[in-house]
Amino acid sequence: MGHRKLASPRRGSAGLRPRKRSSELLPTPRTWPQINSPNPKLLGFVGYKVGMSHVFMIDDWPNSPTNGKEIYMPVTVLEVPPIIPLALRAYAVDGKGEPNVITEYWSPSSLQFLDITRRIHSFSSFLKNDESKKKFEEKFGSKLDLIKSNLDRIVYFRLLVATQPRKIPSLGKKVPDLVEIQIGGGEKKAQLDYALNVLGKEISIKDVFKEGQLIDVVGVTKGKGFAGVIKRYSVVELPRWHKHRKGSRKIGTRGPSLGTPSYTPQPGQLGFHRRTEYNKRIIKIGDDPKEINPAGGFVRYGIVRNTYILLEGSILGSKKRPIFLREAVRPSYVFENAPKITYVNLLSKQG
């Protein structure tokens, strides 16, 4: 009998293909929600993962068996220093019916953020003297006129923002991360005025999110390197007896010799994949790091020195990794108030 008598489901999820390394450490969301807000606002933010802790809080989920009672809740800590918008990008529909960038406008105030030259080296030529700064204004001044004249064609606006890792000594990093964040709410004219008003200014996470709401988390998972089919796809290990002389931690066959099916489990890269986790609740947004720093600091990170947030449960990624926070595209529930926290664990994480 060369075949199996019992059927079993196919191992591995097709929704997670291809299982390859992410091309960028801080990915940009591919989908943005539509919010009903009269005032424009950013639809995302960027933070850096610190570690995990736990709190006791009053359960306020409706229809929960423990509603109104004190419950234990594991939380993930993220350090979220202010971000700085540097440029405005306008998207319009092209001949193929797809939105593409028609132009981008860089504010002269963006040159005050000196760390931008660590990411965009060509900008250092605009910082030599006043004459070079005037060339910068002349170069991008016409871009703003182009945006205003094509306002009826524009589908949406996005801001190119930079993080400030210099404010987090635990990272040991000075080069800012650049990422696009879409503007939602309001009309196109109001969105343009909002973007021009915030260019070159710091934006706090409190200007984007509030305590208690649900958000989505986009990032890159921990890298595991090269792995076999047992760990990579949870394939059932073959029996270990004398006739299985070619190994047990492998698949029985790859298929006919004409070619390997794409869904056949094979060894390869595991981890460091781009993933999105939906509906993570913000438990707390705080400005006082003493409220969350444990004795001795967080393992492999140190102490928090800036604004921080607590997210319900665990999230992807390793410590010190940039994490993109986005407005929930399909929130399961809309909370009106922030949860009531009764206790925050500040004991040492070092054993």
Swiss-Prot record:
Any single biological process term in GO: translation
Gene3D superfamilies in alphabetical order: 3.30.1430.10, Ribosomal protein L3, domain 3, Translation factors
GO molecular function annotation: rRNA binding; structural constituent of ribosome
Chain residue ranges for the region called Disordered: 1-31, 246-271
Keywords: Ribonucleoprotein, Ribosomal protein, RNA-binding, rRNA-binding
Cellular compartments per GO CC: cytosolic large ribosomal subunit
Quaternary assembly: Part of the 50S ribosomal subunit. Forms a cluster with proteins L14 and L24e.
NCBIfam families, A to Z: L3_arch, PRK04231.1
Function comment: One of the primary rRNA binding proteins, it binds directly near the 3'-end of the 23S rRNA, where it nucleates assembly of the 50S subunit.
Family to which this protein belongs: Belongs to the universal ribosomal protein uL3 family.
Official protein name in the record: Large ribosomal subunit protein uL3
Species in which this protein is naturally found: Saccharolobus islandicus (strain M.14.25 / Kamchatka #1) (Sulfolobus islandicus)
Gene that this polypeptide is encoded by: rpl3
